[in-house]
């Protein structure tokens, strides 16, 4: 059975006036534009939140027997999400020494199905919980019983009731950002089995709260006679059913999976609704003609540009997701769970050979920068470029001469390589010959025949460089124009940048196809980046 669930894990909400009445059937009423708003400050977002009633609490009952039942029912469905990597069954995908002990990533039928944590959102909720405890607010978590045995077939039901005052949550995040972020950093730096076990228990509790809350929410909508298809549309999903499918069972199986449930629950805490609000065009901004777009470029002084593989296609470097691109080539050449697995850090550690056989195809060579790269360099020279966030690893921005201070290599580059074991870092040219031979570059310092030098590109499952967060926090204060060029905006957290920027900052998309829907750009140019640049330069005469 094939099920398609569209939109990524940052679930979008349709808020325009024509759909507002429908939305209110599913979620609480969205306030009008003159409703008082609060701003949430965090590492990853600067979002406007709606005011919530001080007396309103969330009551969540957790039943582990129910959770196990959800896991077993959900196991028979395969969900495919565009731009959203759901829970990965590591033991199916990767062959390592431990995988033989597991089936589908868990030891027995009673264990939770999910394998990976969505760390950004987990940390957001951790912040909330920890600050509530430290400030002795009205939040309380009471365990009425907690005995669960997973090593045998016996499972005792655990019931937990959580009461969360939403206004207090927002106030704490708003007023204690630095302190909360420091606390999360301290947690992340802790080393020791006892601390790790404590963290695992905390994450497990968060996931159970989220999944139980979403299950309860679904049951309420079902009991009210809400149409299941309309329910999924209103929270940003498209559900396609086959004959005899039980719609509510499928919805429950998908939305109560760990990552999805945590995202929805986090949205509810932030926005008092399951779906995240999306950006609309600036009503007062007129970009109805190309001439007006050119005028905007001329008047802007702090331009932020997000570039993807589309800006390098004309250089002879294939992009990743289009027809004939990198992922299609990988799919034909290798027997992988999915093409992206070649760039998954877990897969790399378990089986590095496929990546190093393919690395030759994407290793920077003698390619020359495109007209788009040269245009970004021109903006830099004219003092208009605030930052270029590039998702590319081809280093052509460096070749074009863009000031390195104005450049953020979001996904790293081949310029250096680091041993996965001893962390020795060497210049990328050191491993070039080995990669050209399609061999694994072993670490000479470890000299154990197994440790290898990994190019310092960011794999799925790895954190972005610290410089990314540092620059984002600075740039959102100064930016006056955001440009997205040649990017599918499918990989987080870079794909979140258009949402982070103040909604009154103009945004332009230059790409071969429309992306990030239902997010609205103020001007969209569907075509080649180089052609846009040529058309623009013909008008502005720089």
Curated annotation (Swiss-Prot):
<keyword id="KW-0479">Metal-binding</keyword>
<keyword id="KW-0862">Zinc</keyword>
<feature type="active site" description="Proton acceptor">
    <location>
        <position position="411"/>
    </location>
</feature>
<dbReference type="Pfam" id="PF02146">
    <property type="entry name" value="SIR2"/>
</dbReference>
<dbReference type="GO" id="GO:0031507">
    <property type="term" value="P:heterochromatin formation"/>
</dbReference>
<comment type="similarity">
    <text>Belongs to the sirtuin family.</text>
</comment>
<dbReference type="GO" id="GO:0046872">
    <property type="term" value="F:metal ion binding"/>
</dbReference>
<dbReference type="GO" id="GO:0017136">
    <property type="term" value="F:histone deacetylase activity, NAD-dependent"/>
</dbReference>
<feature type="coiled-coil region">
    <location>
        <begin position="165"/>
        <end position="193"/>
    </location>
</feature>
<dbReference type="InterPro" id="IPR026591">
    <property type="entry name" value="Sirtuin_cat_small_dom_sf"/>
</dbReference>
<dbReference type="GO" id="GO:0010628">
    <property type="term" value="P:positive regulation of gene expression"/>
</dbReference>
<feature type="region of interest" description="Disordered">
    <location>
        <begin position="136"/>
        <end position="160"/>
    </location>
</feature>
<dbReference type="InterPro" id="IPR050134">
    <property type="entry name" value="NAD-dep_sirtuin_deacylases"/>
</dbReference>
<protein>
    <recommendedName>
        <fullName>NAD-dependent deacetylase sir2D</fullName>
        <ecNumber>2.3.1.286</ecNumber>
    </recommendedName>
</protein>
<feature type="binding site">
    <location>
        <position position="419"/>
    </location>
    <ligand>
        <name>Zn(2+)</name>
    </ligand>
</feature>
<dbReference type="GO" id="GO:0010629">
    <property type="term" value="P:negative regulation of gene expression"/>
</dbReference>
<dbReference type="GO" id="GO:0005634">
    <property type="term" value="C:nucleus"/>
</dbReference>
<feature type="binding site">
    <location>
        <position position="422"/>
    </location>
    <ligand>
        <name>Zn(2+)</name>
    </ligand>
</feature>
<dbReference type="InterPro" id="IPR003000">
    <property type="entry name" value="Sirtuin"/>
</dbReference>
<dbReference type="GO" id="GO:0006914">
    <property type="term" value="P:autophagy"/>
</dbReference>
<feature type="domain" description="Deacetylase sirtuin-type">
    <location>
        <begin position="283"/>
        <end position="542"/>
    </location>
</feature>
<comment type="function">
    <text>NAD-dependent deacetylase, which plays an important role in the regulation of transcriptional repression.</text>
</comment>
<dbReference type="GO" id="GO:0030587">
    <property type="term" value="P:sorocarp development"/>
</dbReference>
<feature type="region of interest" description="Disordered">
    <location>
        <begin position="1"/>
        <end position="37"/>
    </location>
</feature>
<dbReference type="GO" id="GO:0044671">
    <property type="term" value="P:sorocarp spore cell differentiation"/>
</dbReference>
<keyword id="KW-0175">Coiled coil</keyword>
<dbReference type="InterPro" id="IPR029035">
    <property type="entry name" value="DHS-like_NAD/FAD-binding_dom"/>
</dbReference>
<feature type="binding site">
    <location>
        <position position="446"/>
    </location>
    <ligand>
        <name>Zn(2+)</name>
    </ligand>
</feature>
<feature type="binding site">
    <location>
        <position position="443"/>
    </location>
    <ligand>
        <name>Zn(2+)</name>
    </ligand>
</feature>
<dbReference type="GO" id="GO:0070403">
    <property type="term" value="F:NAD+ binding"/>
</dbReference>
<dbReference type="InterPro" id="IPR026590">
    <property type="entry name" value="Ssirtuin_cat_dom"/>
</dbReference>
<keyword id="KW-0520">NAD</keyword>
<keyword id="KW-0808">Transferase</keyword>
<feature type="compositionally biased region" description="Low complexity">
    <location>
        <begin position="8"/>
        <end position="25"/>
    </location>
</feature>
